[in-house]
Amino acid sequence: MARTVNCIKLGREAEGLDFPPYPGPLGQRIFEHVSKEAWQQWIKMQTMIINENRLNLVDAKHRKYLAEQVEKHFFGEGADQIQGYVPPAA
């Protein structure tokens, strides 16, 4: 039986991640409170953030910025918006 979590992003019970997706306490917090579905949404957002901001993940400052964005996305006011990006109409 799949592990379920009360997903903080979706606001409902959903299938949980199989393992912490990020190192340290932040990864454990994500593991305990974020669903697979919400994590996949983050992966898409993360890709846009990396590409549009031309982040180089070898650079410690860029990794720190991305870590701040993942924390804001799930546990804060939301990640920074991509300049010029307009979400598709539902």
From Swiss-Prot:
Coiled coil: none annotated. InterPro entries: Fe_traffick_prot_YggX, Fe_traffick_prot_YggX_sf. One of its GO terms (molecular function) is iron ion binding. GO terms for cellular component: cytosol. One of its GO terms (biological process) is cellular response to oxidative stress. Keywords: Iron. Belongs to the Fe(2+)-trafficking protein family. PANTHER family: FE(2+)-TRAFFICKING PROTEIN-RELATED. HAMAP family: Fe_traffic_YggX (MF_00686). Could be a mediator in iron transactions between iron acquisition and iron-requiring processes, such as synthesis and/or repair of Fe-S clusters in biosynthetic enzymes. This is Probable Fe(2+)-trafficking protein.
